[in-house]
């Protein structure tokens, strides 16, 4: 079995990103990412720190805007508008989830599509489904890069994606379709789920159920991408597939951790750098 090691690829790409940032600085532009965090959700704080740490590592400018949990939607939208208008800001990211008094859709739609490094805006999602250039959700983008790095061609393959979220399942389906795969999206209402997943040449598991997919649900020789992050009672982290059972059954598989996760932040940095390159072109 080939191990699809996201951490190793992320480290390679991080070195390349450091060089790209140095080149941009020589041209008078420092890529800048602004992360907005509303409230003090512990998980959000960890994700936010990881993003800032990586940005600093590659030499980018990074700013965290911390707002209280009582922040109104109008106040948050006003901040987003200010950042949209700031020419020194390349990427804007609003850490989700938001407090209940704020409509997430309104906020995502307010972010300038050209600065929407999460790739969640309706404009970017529309461009993705039309197979046109735009900013793409980072986890699906990272999955495609990981497959490409291991020379796994998805064209003509049967791809089953289990999970239909706007963050992973739906955008990944579009990317796979654009790469000429035959795509099926499965979800909680799918009948005979494991019979369906067993037909997949490439299986993407993103349902949040530890060890849900074993040999009975996976075709021999398949490629398995495990997006699941599940914390067990002993504190360990595991994915949606039974990694141990499948090691001798599949041709390639991502581990959890060290698989898809490291690629997500790496793609976030890459998109911010690409936006900064466009700023250089505009002068």
UniProtKB/Swiss-Prot annotation:
InterPro entries membership: Aminoacid_DH-like_N_sf (IPR046346), NAD(P)-bd_dom_sf (IPR036291), THF_DH/CycHdrlase (IPR000672), THF_DH/CycHdrlase_cat_dom (IPR020630), THF_DH/CycHdrlase_CS (IPR020867), THF_DH/CycHdrlase_NAD-bd_dom (IPR020631)
E.C. code: 1.5.1.5, 3.5.4.9
Keyword line: Amino-acid biosynthesis, Histidine biosynthesis, Hydrolase, Methionine biosynthesis, Multifunctional enzyme, NADP, One-carbon metabolism, Oxidoreductase, Purine biosynthesis
Gene3D superfamilies (alphabetical): Leucine Dehydrogenase, chain A, domain 1, NAD(P)-binding Rossmann-like Domain
Pathway the protein contributes to: One-carbon metabolism; tetrahydrofolate interconversion
HAMAP family attached to this UniProt entry: THF_DHG_CYH
Quaternary organization: Homodimer.
Protein family per UniProt: Belongs to the tetrahydrofolate dehydrogenase/cyclohydrolase family.
Protein name per its UniProtKB record: Bifunctional protein FolD
Gene: folD
